[in-house]
């Protein structure tokens, strides 16, 4: 499993609704991709210009192949990237002691 957290900050207030709409359109495309286990976008109540993407992929290779898909090529790159700053964090889920280590 390959887990990814992406933290997005929208640069200009008028772009917040545009980014939210684009992210909502990406979801179905991402979920239809080979190896996408789950893909969720969240918007902060406290700071509406902040979004968090939580992605779970079957493998890093599946996530890397995702870059060539329609969600990235037709929505993320042209509609979202020009309006944001982002942090990309490949991540490991912290499990409780009885579940065993993940690292």
Where are these regions (language model features)?
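Glycine-rich beta-strand-turn "strand-cap" elements at beta-sheet edges
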Residues: 2, 40-49, 75-103
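Active-site-flanking beta-strand signature of metal-NTP-handling nucleotidyl enzymes
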Residues: 2-9
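Hydrophobic pocket/interface hotspot
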Residues: 6, 19, 39, 53, ...
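Short, surface-exposed ligand-recognition loops at beta-strand->loop->(often short) alpha-helix junctions
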Residues: 9-19
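Localized chelating/binding microdomains
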Residues: 10, 53, 86
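Short, charged/polar surface micro-motifs in flexible loops or helix N-caps
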Residues: 12-13, 47-48, 58-61
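Short, glycine- and small/hydrophobic-rich beta-strand elements in well-ordered beta-sheets
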Residues: 24-52
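An amphipathic, aromatic/His-enriched active-site/gating alpha helix that lines ligand/cofactor pockets
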Residues: 31-32, 37, 56-89
